[in-house]
Amino acid sequence: MGTNNTSNNNGTTKKMSLEEFLGNDTLGESVWDEEDINLDAISNTTNIDILKQTKAGEHQRDGHQQHPHGGHGPMNRSRFSNAGPFGGGSMGDFANHHHPLQHQQGPPYIVKFSDLPPRFSNFDIEDLFQAKFTKFIKFKLFWEINKNPSISTLKSGSIFDQNFKRDSKVAFVELYTSRDMDKILNYWTTPLKEIYHITTAPAEFEDFKDYSTKVKLLTDPKDDAGKPFITKTQRSKSNPFGSAKPVDTQSKILDIEEKMENLHVEDTTTLRASLIPSSDSMATTATGSKITILKKQTPTEEESHSATPTPKPLSYSEVVERSVVNETSKKGTPLSKLDSPALELQSKPDKSDEFKGGDEQGFEKGGDDKAQLDVSNDKDKGSETDVDKQFTFKNVEREHSMSRTKYNGNHNNNNGNFRGSNRYRGGPNGSSYKGGHNNRGNRGGYRGGSSYNNNNNNTNDNNNNNNNSSSNNNNGSRYHDRQNNEEGLTSDSSLDASGNKKNDFTNSTSNTQQYSIFKPASGFLGQGNNDSIRNNGRGNYNSSGMNGGSRGRGFGRGRGFGRGAYNNRGSRGGRGSSGNYSNYNNRTTDMPL
């Protein structure tokens, strides 16, 4: 057996294939017999202490008393020689290679972090170890010790300045195991130094005691190293204006305003004089400058007497009266006062409605003679009452309705104007008589008054009842008819012996009809006779010849019969409640509305 081994060692080594190795029976028939393997020994956990004792026994038995790398530990052996569980002591050899053996002696395992910035705090230490997934037992922050203080600092400096510096801090961290310490020293040192300028090294216990002793001298809580210390640097602002200074204009303005209030004057020359120094002001006052204050001149006696007195405020009735007068004057209605007292209207003894008050207007009597009307028309005077007195209206039950003027057919064309003037709406009307040579009727009077137009153009031009008229026409009469007249007045036309038309105004009550206050346009209800048409408001009675028709406006603003076919066109009706009434001749009949 020994000769074979020597021959094999001396000769070339024969390589065995896998088949030859499996078929070799040199080590026994069942090399891979599972029964020969102790499974209990494999399942047991290997104890590090047992391995250490085993290795120590082997070293003592072999007579090796010194570590191969020269490291000496207590009891003449290295502390980290067999620290690794995997044998060989490689972890301990690597640690001893980088650091002296005296720093690795037993717990506590403490690492020192130096050159920390002043803002470093307890939170930053915890954050660092949490980021690296490393646990620690405890830590302590200190200010860096001032090892060489200056003489001035030792004499006049504070306790903190004599022992510590505020430029940097140090931290001592105690770890659980030596593996954590080796990890920090091997893998954290270079990044922390390059990025944060932090130095990492194993801590010495004597150094830790020195820091702990000096920190007890600090009593001010502001000197706690565990809190961040941030120096407040005041930045000096650069003046954008350089050496220039802003001008104080506000004080000057306030000074000027104060002087203006004291002087109570707005004269700029006086203000300037007040701003001049005292020496200059004396010179200016010596020249005799005076302050002139502008005031409103009081009026003299002559001007005060010549000035018109302030008019008194007008009452409501006076304002209404003036407005009515202005309107009538604009329309060109002649208003003439009577020299004689107003004539009273003849009335029957059984009249039920009458006008009471100082503002009464007289009506011309209706006579049998047409010459009387012509004379009154020639005088061109209307009755007018005193307007300064108040007008009152007594509204009693009426037996007679308002007067209606009825005009039957005639053989002539009569042209007349009737334009009523109404000082108070709904009051009596002042009438005027004005003849004219018109083939066309005119508009009616003011609201509440009735108009009567009568065309009397004589074909022979030989009958002129108006003595003062220079026209070739028979002037019609102008007549105002109140909507609430005390009597019903009718106008009947007839022919005299000479063939001329004769207008007779008589008092008639046979054709009267009850008037409804709530139905001012009661004729609109369909009554067919001529009396149903009430001449209220501004309506006109237009008659234009034998076959002519008038284009009057009916009840409200409706249109009447239409434009005449043969003769002149009728005049426009008013806005009152009455419409226009057209008559052709004696033989024509009135058309119902």
UniProtKB/Swiss-Prot annotation:
Residues 56-65, 347-402 have a biased composition (Basic and acidic residues). The modification Phosphoserine is found at S150, S238, S340, S522. One of its GO terms (biological process) is tRNA 5'-leader removal. One of its GO terms (cellular component) is cytoplasmic stress granule. It is found in: Cytoplasm; Cytoplasm, P-body; Cytoplasm, Stress granule. Residues 546-563 have a biased composition (Gly residues). The modification Omega-N-methylarginine is found at R419, R425, R440, R447, R538, R551, R575. The modification Dimethylated arginine is found at R443. It comes from the Eukaryota. Keywords: Cytoplasm, Methylation, Phosphoprotein. One of its GO terms (molecular function) is mRNA binding. Residues 231-241, 280-290, 486-497, 505-516 have a biased composition (Polar residues). Residues 56-101, 227-248, 280-593 are annotated as: Disordered. Residues 408-426, 449-477, 534-545, 578-587 have a biased composition (Low complexity). Present with 2190 molecules/cell in log phase SD medium. DNA polymerase alpha mutation suppressor. Suppressor of group II intron splicing defects of a mutation in MRS2. May play a role in mitochondrial mRNA splicing. This is Protein PSP2. The lineage of its organism: Eukaryota, Fungi, Dikarya, Ascomycota, Saccharomycotina.
